[in-house]
């Protein structure tokens, strides 16, 4: 008998080409993490998200995910609002006009530094938009103490709070497995004949769907 578990297909096909997505993952249980992150990235690309618009950051463990997601979201707004001059720290290229340092009364001049191509500063792939969604990926495997329960509950509540406080979808990609094999199967790398299913694929689909819907809802557009 086939399982009834799993999400139904989305009601529409979503185009991720205009989206910018962040992945924040822990480094505990690296074998499983690597498979999940790979599955997530592959799905995002299949949904049209450009590789240059996928940013991957890591933290030590799952407990650090909520803070990291919050900081990544706020930092992307800083990036999007920054000008080329902001990101270059106010340096001037190819000009004799000095700039004054905030930490020293002496003028700072970079007039001797040639600009790339000789025509002015060039910034490759300067971000122009904040993140439309963040995918938090972690792997918690129950051990002999209550550590598993405390971390699972704390991280779950904190990630929910991040998305409610910021208005940016945070996809819950934290596996809470009772055994090593459960974790491996949920990353599609089980040791048995049935390798399981890589949940990173589901998280990639959810990120594109929620990011697209959030944009639409923010504009007051709803399905008829």
Predicted regions and their residues:
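Structural motif
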Residues: 132-133
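Charged, often glycine-rich, active-site loop that binds/positions anionic groups
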Residues: 66-80
